[in-house]
Amino acid sequence: MTRPLSYFHLHLISDATGETLLAAGRAAAAQYANARAIEHIYPLIRTEKQLRKVLEGIDAEPGIVLYTIVDQKLAAIIDDSCAEMGVPSVSVLEPVLNTFQSYLGAPAHRRASAQHVLNADYFRRIDALNFTMEHDDGQLPYDIEEADVILVGISRTSKTPTSIYLANRGIKATNVPIVLGIPLPEVLFTAKRPLIVGLVATAERISQIRQNRPLGNVPSLDTGLYTDRVSISEELAYARNICNRNGWPIIDVSRRSIEETAAAILALLRAHNEKG
């Protein structure tokens, strides 16, 4: 018998943006199919006054409390207050910091938002994002050799979101659509530095996505072909043939999240760069 869906409050308190905490909370919540978290996110909490207001909200809607607060005084207030309210509280980073401290033999500096310093890595990500957004969907740059990754594939194979995810990791990614019967730009076949990866999916999966998100510039007479599984299968065979002829690796994204697809591409990129 299927258990009914239940809901619970999940309070996420951070002295930074809360991205780390949100990812951890959602990863844990995803393990419970019959429970849904009502998320309450409190970023940039760095004073006791701010924290007291947050705690009032938790008292009004009790639930699990996760926090990433490096100030030990504020962390103690959270734990003590939650204990009084009878709700669980967990410092997500504390076990990790303790492990680092034990292994490195040195205490952490405990600086809020230390991971968000405007350093070279930060500006590399911004540069990659600009590159990706300027060269999305076949807008190949004259300086194509600056690209780290070029994704190719038929419509609705997650090329753009995967490119953007990679750019957030500091990877200059661009993408080129494969359209049945239309030759790809010659520059793709002469590029030396970029890793070129083909993205595919099942015809069923692509048809479903295309029905939900039709392509705006498809003429009405072609709309049926755009979502027809037989036609999509022909497109996929055409795309696979191109990739196989050129030795481009292929990733099936049918059952992969964007994160999983990006992880596979990053593994291919490491091997590509090692070969030189």
Curated annotation (Swiss-Prot):
Entry EC no(s): 2.7.11.32, 2.7.4.27
Source domain of life: Bacteria
Record keywords, A-Z: Kinase, Nucleotide-binding, Serine/threonine-protein kinase, Transferase
Record field: catalytic activity: N(tele)-phospho-L-histidyl/L-threonyl-[pyruvate, phosphate dikinase] + ADP = N(tele)-phospho-L-histidyl/O-phospho-L-threonyl-[pyruvate, phosphate dikinase] + AMP + H(+); N(tele)-phospho-L-histidyl/O-phospho-L-threonyl-[pyruvate, phosphate dikinase] + phosphate + H(+) = N(tele)-phospho-L-histidyl/L-threonyl-[pyruvate, phosphate dikinase] + diphosphate
Keyword Nucleotide-binding: yes
GO MF annotations in UniProt: ADP binding; ATP binding; phosphotransferase activity, phosphate group as acceptor; protein serine/threonine kinase activity
Keyword Nucleotide-binding annotated: yes
Pfam families: Kinase-PPPase
Binding site residues for ADP: G153, I154, S155, R156, T157, S158, K159, T160
Broad EC category: transferase
Family annotation (HAMAP family): PDRP
Role, per record: Bifunctional serine/threonine kinase and phosphorylase involved in the regulation of the pyruvate, phosphate dikinase (PPDK) by catalyzing its phosphorylation/dephosphorylation.
UniProt record similarity statement: Belongs to the pyruvate, phosphate/water dikinase regulatory protein family. PDRP subfamily.
Protein name: Putative pyruvate, phosphate dikinase regulatory protein
